[in-house]
Amino acid sequence: MYSKTIPAMLAIITVAYLCALPHAHARSTQGYGRMDRILAALKTSPMEPSAALAVENGTTHPLEKRQIYDTSCKGVYDRALFNDLEHVCDDCYNLYRTSYVASACRSNCYSNLVFRQCMDDLLMMDEFDQYARKVQMVGRKK
């Protein structure tokens, strides 16, 4: 009895795996392509400081990658808020392994398109409203 059901179950599992695999691959490559386009647009933007480009070329040390408190953030200083926002940028850096992603994610006190794209690529969009409130709190002018 079991000798007939085991091969059938293995066949079903194999078919399900093969059907899901192309979709998983397309999601990750699609996210990587979007991030490349965002970063390329930021690099060519005249408003972007040249220091970020120097970091990408390796001429300076990217201290902002490890910086927990951004002096441009004029709102509430709460370590828990910064820690939550910092984890998104750190995870995004670990996903793409590009120092420019880390610095662009933190720019303008986390209120930027790269931060949102990082949340999307990390599959965290169901928590976006919660993180948007945190960004508003740390970036609010006094």
From Swiss-Prot:
Per the record, residues carrying Pyrrolidone carboxylic acid are Q67
Instruction: Name where it mostly resides.
Output: secreted
Give its localization: Secreted
What does UniProt give as the signal peptide span? 1-26
Q: Name one GO biological process term.
A: neuropeptide signaling pathway
Q: Does the keyword tRNA processing apply?
A: no
| Pfam families the UniProt entry points to | Crust_neuro_H, Crust_neurohorm
Keyword terms, alphabetized: Amidation, Carbohydrate metabolism, Cleavage on pair of basic residues, Disulfide bond, Glucose metabolism, Hormone, Neuropeptide, Pyrrolidone carboxylic acid, Secreted, Signal
Q: Does the keyword Ribonucleoprotein apply?
A: no
Q: According to the UniProt record, list the residues that bear Valine amide.
A: V138
Q: Which InterPro entries match?
A: Crust_neurhormone_CS, Crust_neurhormone_H, Crust_neurohorm, Crust_neurohorm_sf, Hyperglycemic, Hyperglycemic1
Kindly list the cysteine pairs connected by disulfide bridges. Answer: C73-C109, C89-C105, C92-C118
Tissues of expression: Produced by the medulla terminalis X-organ in the eyestalks and transported to the sinus gland where they are stored and released.
* Any one GO MF annotation of this record: neuropeptide hormone activity
For this record, the Gene Ontology CC terms, alphabetical, are:
extracellular region
Q: What does the record say about PTM?
A: The N-terminus is blocked only in isoform CHH-II but not in isoform CHH-I.
| Physiological role | Hormone found in the sinus gland of isopods and decapods which controls the blood sugar level. Has a secretagogue action over the amylase released from the midgut gland. May act as a stress hormone and may be involved in the control of molting and reproduction.
Q: Which family does it belong to?
A: Belongs to the arthropod CHH/MIH/GIH/VIH hormone family.
Q: How is this protein named in the record?
A: Crustacean hyperglycemic hormones
The species is Carcinus maenas (Common shore crab)
